[in-house]
Amino acid sequence: CVMARRYRAVLGMTGDNLLHSDYNRGMMLRDGRIFRSQTQVSLMALTEDFSMRIYNAKDAAMLNEIEEGTQDTFAFGPPLILNGVICDKVDEDRVGRINPRAGLGLVEPGHFVAIVADGRLPHYSHGMMLSDFAKLFLDEGCVMAYNLDGGASATMVFMGEYINKRASNHYRSVPDQLLWGYSEQVPTEDDPYRLQGLVPQDWRKGDS
C-alpha cells in the first residue's frame, strides 16, 4: 500500500515474487530495462501497446532476447489461460493448492482484468484452487491470464486503501506491485489508513 500511495496510483496489486529461490526466478524487465535475463520459469510480458504475452517455462527458457516493445515481465506463474482456454493440469503446479490469489488477465489490448482472492481465513475465505481462480478470468472474457504472487502477499489497493482482507494481520514487505492510474486524491504515505485489510482474530481460528 505504501508503494501505491507513493506514486498516487488509483489501483495497485501484488506483482512478482522477488524473494524466491534463484531457480524459480525468471527474466525481469521494468520500464524496458533488463534487471535479470536468465529464466527457467514461465513468463508474462506486458507490452507498450497495452497487450500481454505469456510464455510457458520451455518457451521462456529458449528466449535469446525479449521481444521488441516489451516493457515489463513477471515470472511467478503459472499461466492460467492461453488462447481462451484454461491451461491443463494447472492445479498440479507448486502453488496449485487452495491459497489466497492474485492474477492479471487480458480481454483485449488495453482491457485488463485484475483479481485478488482472499484466503487462509477459515471464517471468511479459505482461498482458491488455481483452476477455480482461472475460471474467474474466463468468466470475465479473458483470452490470457497469469497467476501472480498470492498467499500472504496477496493485496489489492484502491485509492490508497486496502480493499481485500489480508491473510495475516502482520504487514508483509511486498517488493513489487502493479500500479495503474494517477490521482492527486490518493492519500500520501504519511496519511492515516481508513481501510487496512485487517480481520477479527477469531476469523482465523478453526474451520467452517
Task: Give the location of each predicted region.
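Gly/Ser/Thr/Pro-rich low-complexity, intrinsically disordered segments
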Residues: 1-208
